[in-house]
Amino acid sequence: MELSWVRLAWMTKVTELHAGARRGDLPAMRRLLESDPKLANARSETDARGTFPLHVAAEAGQTEAARLLLEYGAEISTTDLENEAHALGWVAFFGRPDIVEMLLAAGSAPSQRNKHGLTPLGCALGGTEGRWRKFSDASIEDWHRAAEMIRAKGGVE
């Protein structure tokens, strides 16, 4: 019985961290990460996409949340379950150039393909063509900036 309570407490913290990353709630995120830094690499068990906090911050365009997660050891190479995409693929897809720059500086591989065969550059270029507008509030300029940064680091389509 005790193990189930421990598991429930862990899942609650993971859910809270993902929610904090989505909102950019740095104080709440810092509190959780200070209590258990392993949370930075905890896959959501309530999101069917199987995301990590860094994916959520990327999707929401929460640059400072992404920076905090990296400070606490978030892995840049983890992939979600739905698309098997790294965080760089997520930020490129959602048109978040500031986080693209951050992940590239942290050593994220610019040519990793997701399960659909798309690279981060391919994701960003899809945004410049307007294909992802229904998923993101990014501007076409944001997608162009993201694509140029990825291309400059050797990203391929």
Language-model-detected regions and their locations in the chain:
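N-terminal segments that cap or nucleate solenoid repeat domains
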Residues: L3-R49
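Ankyrin-repeat boundary/"N-cap" motif
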Residues: M11-L17, R43-P53, T79-H86, R113-G126
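Ankyrin repeat domain, specifically the short helix-to-loop turn at the C-terminus of the second helix
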Residues: L33-L39, R67-E75, E101-A109, M149-V156
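A generic tandem-repeat structural signature
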Residues: E75-I99, A105
